[in-house]
């Protein structure tokens, strides 16, 4: 963590202290959204993500899909919701609302051919996997969510563990 703290201080010197609070928040929202969506296969660059933030659906670059644009716009919505709710404790309500916002315009499209459709803001009704990772019995995992949220909130409240370690 000491290396992390050194990097954070250097980042503050080079980037964040040179921006207004509003600009810094928007800068992070754009970077976070672009890179988070890229992990899921979205091909928007950071610059294209910034332009989409500024101009909305009126600007979809050549070769990009409406689905990709909606993924990023939904991500913006979820990011802004969480930013406005930083003081709220971690609850299933917060988790589900974040998921609803994050997938509002894309989940039904992505799962339209699935036998069991998924709904934004709701837990899965089937066991899930990603690549060669199988996550286990979805019903058992769902039962553990309240305990996970509560224990994570307790650790955050205690301030004894650095948030980056918790993440």
Residue ranges, per PLM feature:
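FIC/Doc superfamily catalytic core
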Residues: 1-167
